[in-house]
Amino acid sequence: MTECFLPPTSSPSEHRRVEHGSGLTRTPSSEEISPTKFPGLYRTGEPSPPHDILHEPPDVVSDDEKDHGKKKGKFKKKEKRTEGYAAFQEDSSGDEAESPSKMKRSKGIHVFKKPSFSKKKEKDFKIKEKPKEEKHKEEKHKEEKHKEKKSKDLTAADVVKQWKEKKKKKKPIQEPEVPQIDVPNLKPIFGIPLADAVERTMMYDGIRLPAVFRECIDYVEKYGMKCEGIYRVSGIKSKVDELKAAYDREESTNLEDYEPNTVASLLKQYLRDLPENLLTKELMPRFEEACGRTTETEKVQEFQRLLKELPECNYLLISWLIVHMDHVIAKELETKMNIQNISIVLSPTVQISNRVLYVFFTHVQELFGNVVLKQVMKPLRWSNMATMPTLPETQAGIKEEIRRQEFLLNCLHRDLQGGIKDLSKEERLWEVQRILTALKRKLREAKRQECETKIAQEIASLSKEDVSKEEMNENEEVINILLAQENEILTEQEELLAMEQFLRRQIASEKEEIERLRAEIAEIQSRQQHGRSETEEYSSESESESEDEEELQIILEDLQRQNEELEIKNNHLNQAIHEEREAIIELRVQLRLLQMQRAKAEQQAQEDEEPEWRGGAVQPPRDGVLEPKAAKEQPKAGKEPAKPSPSRDRKETSI
């Protein structure tokens, strides 16, 4: 007989063996050998899923039987004994069930079978492999249980850390798809048709030429006429690309920071990138034919006729270019550039043959005698808010600058209303509005000073002895001007006093709001201090406290920086609002003056239309009542109401 390790007699397996009819022992089923009865049989430390026989069909094999079949396959070669019971080294204790490391050590399982055990019974223990989907579900189920078990042992800091990691992972998934909006993107200035570049960058004076062309021409005319090899020597490529990118973005550039050769190379680059020939494809062969005429007179006449057929933009650009190059040739001693050199440089750039260029350069006066290169005056800038820009002193200069700023303002409005989102253009819009307000204010002051000086000169020229009625009639215009100025000053004073009262009320409400916010801040600070004292012990034990503090510090610095930027924007906005209020006051004053003048004119016209009735003794009946002539003088006396006195207003409202 072979040796067999049997369980105690009180175990249920012994009773089942006794009840069995044959003398052979049978292999225990998966229900008899389960992880709950024999915990040392399995390596895994996780509890097996509940096994419910009632809810399973008879043909389906349970999870415990599948696990048992896998384990039994490992020991299949070792089963050479007759008995099919497993002998354990020691009974598993409660400590082994808790620690998986101890359970791994308890692998000493000895299984004994009879050598005559049939292969048919072995097939009963073979398990069909699960489909991949079921395995995937089981793995997910186990992972979820493992996570639940871990979540019970986590601290608060670990929970916060896991929540942040989940949030970072979910962010790209949860972001909704933003619908694509077709934002109009402006094409660059270089490489677009000449007419489009003119429409986008034309200067305020109405000359239909691109801004980059005019600014380069002006710069070379001013600084490049003494530069040797101008247009022949190439500029620094990086500087040229930098200027090109700035003009493509329609940014204002200062060409005085660059060398003449760099600006000349930029001009050649612009002409080279033009998609169409300056003389057009249709007229270019005819210009070539005109060069073959026998006499110079015929050449000039044919060229004049062909130049008139060119589009306006093309004619202006070719005329300005030839006149400018003629100025360069005239300075041949300094520039070392003659007609041949200029033609060699310009011919491949503008795609015009040397024959045509030679005719242009030799007959500049006949072809372009009336062309004058007008210098570009850039609009005034107010880049630094701390300092006031230098405004023109004369009225003519102020009016010219106002026209430039208004043209620029219209261009900016056109671009922004077209759907182009550009923060630099929005800031430039505010800047132009501030400059316009300052210019209009200075223009009014200049007009007032001119009027005052004129009045003072006229008064000084008069002598007190020669004052007569005729002279008083001559000075009636001066008196009317003085009265109009007085009315304007008084109405302006009334508007300013009304604004003062409004601002005082606003300041009082703002002070109350400040006090309320201070009280809220103090209350929040006290709550924070109380909360910190309660959580000091917990925060000292947390491992991720330093990381949270660093993140909070970074967030705080970011918020402080954003707050500073918002304060700067707020100051700019307040200043703009203040300027707009001043402009509104001035408009109100003008409106009131116009209303007063209109009322006075209507009253005067009404008095002139009233005929004298009954020899002027009695006025015509009004509503059946006769009015004497003395009553006629009453509206005249009440025609001009009592004007407010500035000294009395100052006493009433202390500023």
From Swiss-Prot:
Region annotation Mediates interaction with REPS1 and REPS2: where it falls in the sequence: 500-655
Region (Mediates interaction with RALA and RALB): 403-499
Amino acid composition bias (Basic residues), ranges on this chain: 69-79, 102-118
An example Gene Ontology molecular-function term: GTPase activator activity
Bilayer topology term: Peripheral membrane protein
Residues recorded with modification N-acetylthreonine: T2
Residues annotated as domain Rho-GAP: 192-380
Keywords assigned: Acetylation, ATP-binding, Cell membrane, Cytoplasm, Cytoskeleton, GTPase activation, Membrane, Mitochondrion, Nucleotide-binding, Nucleus, Phosphoprotein, Translocase, Transport
Biased composition (Acidic residues): 536-551
Cell compartment(s), UniProt: Cell membrane; Cytoplasm, Cytosol; Cytoplasm, Cytoskeleton, Spindle pole; Nucleus
Job description of the protein: Multifunctional protein that functions as a downstream effector of RALA and RALB. As a GTPase-activating protein/GAP can inactivate CDC42 and RAC1 by stimulating their GTPase activity. As part of the Ral signaling pathway, may also regulate ligand-dependent EGF and insulin receptors-mediated endocytosis. During mitosis, may act as a scaffold protein in the phosphorylation of EPSIN/EPN1 by the mitotic kinase cyclin B-CDK1, preventing endocytosis during that phase of the cell cycle. During mitosis, also controls mitochondrial fission as an effector of RALA. Could also function as a primary ATP-dependent active transporter for glutathione conjugates of electrophiles. May also actively catalyze the efflux of a wide range of substrates including xenobiotics like doxorubicin (DOX) contributing to cell multidrug resistance.
Entry protein name: RalA-binding protein 1
Top-level taxonomy: Eukaryota, Metazoa, Chordata, Craniata, Vertebrata
